[in-house]
Each structure stands twice: as C-alpha cells, then as structure tokens.
C-alpha cells in the first residue's frame, strides 16, 4: 500500500499508549487526541506549496515564504471534532468542510447524513480527519463525495487504522495518501479495530 504513511515518533507512541488505556478519563482522552493530531499534521503537510514574499523585519527587508496551498479540513462527524482544533492551530487560515457519517449498529456500515463544504472547496487541498480507520467504508464514501464535488487534492489523517480497511481503500483510491499513527492487528466480528481504543466518539464526548 504505497499510499499509506505510518507516522512513527516516540511522543506519538507514548501518547497512544495512554489513549488506548480503558481507564483514561474523557478529559485526558480529548487532550491526547488533540496532541497526537497536532503532531501528525506536520508530516501530512510536509509537501504543501509555498510562495515567496518580501518581509520587513525591524532590521532589514528579507525574502520569506508563506503557504500557497489553500487547505480545507474535513472532519468526519462526530469523533473527528476532537482533532479539529489542533489542525486549526497549525493552519489557522484553513476552511472547514463538514462530513456527517453515522455508524449503523445493525449493518456496521456508515450512513451519510450531512455535508457542508466551503464555496471554493474545489480549489483547496482537502485533509479528511477521523481518529479511526476501520473498514474503510466511511473513508471511501467521504472521498467519493469530495470527488463528486470537484475536489481533486485529498489526504486522509487517522490516528489508528485496521489493515483490512487500508487495503480496501487503497485498491479504490491509490492516489489518496493516508497518514496514520498505528496500523493495528485486525477487525473483529463487529468491525471494531483490535486492539484499538474502543469507540473514539463516545470517549471524546463522554457518552459511554
């Protein structure tokens, strides 16, 4: 899977260990999701385009570079809202395009229910964020929706992923890079990631 980027860093691994722990409290879980996302966004944005500008410092005029790429952050509701602030902190001029998917517990499939994109979405790099990448179904549907709305540049950031979902996604969208901090063992019979960390949305919003 050439499009999958596993981000390995001692700080991320340390925070992941606490994030996975079932005894980690919701307030700490939210903080860890935010911090891990903060660290991951650096790697995912490594190839953004820059433009040269002239800056007047207190001492002299110098050349500098600023972002030329316009970014649209696309959190998948609701769990990804826990990742949004950290990305905004790094890219404050980004726009947000909301994508709403809800898991159907009977079918274990994600059902689309809401979308709100900025008017200039098609001219932006879309960075989809979702803490869990399980079957790949939500990711596939999210990319399909963006492509149908003329968004050409897309990346995906997920904290934990399952190999089954990554393989399925990569077969359909080999051109979309996926950044993850961990590739776990497998999916269980309910399509939950093993060992995983449970339901990220419930743990972020304390609705267990």
From Swiss-Prot:
EC number(s) for this protein? 2.4.2.9
Catalytic reaction list: UMP + diphosphate = 5-phospho-alpha-D-ribose 1-diphosphate + uracil
Under Pfam families, the record lists:
UPRTase
* Residues that bind uracil: 193, 198-200
Instruction: Provide the alphabetized UniProt keywords.
Output: Allosteric enzyme, Glycosyltransferase, GTP-binding, Magnesium, Nucleotide-binding, Transferase
Q: Where are the transmembrane segments?
A: none
Name the needed cofactors: Mg(2+)
Q: What does this protein do?
A: Catalyzes the conversion of uracil and 5-phospho-alpha-D-ribose 1-diphosphate (PRPP) to UMP and diphosphate.
Q: Which HAMAP family match?
A: Upp_B
The protein in question is named Uracil phosphoribosyltransferase
């Amino acid at each position: 899977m050439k499009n999958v980027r596993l981000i390995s860093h001692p700080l991320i691994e340390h925070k992941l260990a606490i994030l996975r722990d079932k005894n980690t409290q919701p307030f700490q879980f939210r903080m860890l999701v935010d911090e891990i996302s903060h660290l991951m966004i650096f790697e995912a944005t490594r190839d953004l385009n820059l433009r040269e500008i002239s800056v007047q410092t207190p001492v002299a005029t110098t050349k500098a570079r600023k972002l030329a790429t316009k970014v649209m952050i696309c959190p998948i509701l609701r769990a990804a809202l826990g990742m949004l602030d950290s990305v905004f902190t790094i890219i404050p001029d980004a726009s947000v395009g909301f994508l709403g998917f809800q898991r159907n517990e009977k079918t274990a499939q994600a059902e689309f229910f809401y979308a709100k994109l900025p008017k200039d979405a098609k001219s932006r790099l879309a960075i989809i964020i979702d803490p869990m990448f399980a079957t790949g179904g939500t990711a596939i549907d999210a990319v399909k929706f963006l492509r149908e709305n003329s968004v050409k540049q897309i990346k995906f950031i997920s904290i934990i992923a399952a190999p089954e979902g990554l393989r399925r996604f990569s077969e359909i969208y080999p051109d979309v890079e996926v950044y993850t901090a961990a590739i776990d063992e497998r999916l269980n019979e309910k399509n939950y990631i093993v060992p995983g960390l449970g339901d990220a949305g419930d743990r972020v919003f304390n609705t267990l």
